[in-house]
């Protein structure tokens, strides 16, 4: 009986570890998607860059996107 319980728990642990690994592989944020300011989660070769929005000289908040590393946007 102890062997069956141990085997069941070991199998459950292995299945849980496989599931967590599969979730981590596809968890990156794609290009152009909104991200957070912690700079984590963007897919490889992308960085989370944040820009402040202004309307009529009043700041309306900050928005962050996953974009190519080293690219900056400016209003001309």
UniProtKB/Swiss-Prot annotation:
The main location is secreted
| Any Pfam family matching the protein | Toxin_35
InterPro entries in the cross-refs? Spider_toxin_CSTX_knottin (IPR019553)
Any one of the GO CC terms: extracellular region
Q: Please report the propeptide residues according to the UniProt annotation.
A: 23-26
Claim: Disulfide bond is one of the keywords in the record: yes
Q: From the UniProt annotation, give the residues forming the signal peptide.
A: 1-22
Which UniProt key words apply to this protein? Disulfide bond, Secreted, Signal, Toxin
Q: Does the keyword Disulfide bond apply?
A: yes
* GO MF entries: toxin activity
Q: In which tissues is it expressed?
A: Expressed by the venom gland.
Family from the record: Belongs to the neurotoxin 19 (CSTX) family. 07 (U7-Lctx) subfamily.
Q: Kindly provide the name given to this protein in its UniProt entry.
A: U7-lycotoxin-Ls1b
Recorded source organism is: Lycosa singoriensis (Wolf spider)
């Amino acid at each position: 009986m102890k062997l069956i319980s141990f085997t069941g728990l070991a199998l459950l642990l292995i299945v849980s570890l496989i599931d967590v690994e599969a979730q981590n592989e596809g968890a990156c944020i794609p290009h152009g998607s909104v991200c957070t300011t912690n700079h984590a989660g963007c897919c490889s070769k992308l960085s989370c860059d944040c820009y402040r929005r202004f309307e009529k000289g009043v700041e309306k908040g900050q928005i962050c996107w996953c974009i190519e590393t080293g690219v900056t946007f400016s209003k001309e």
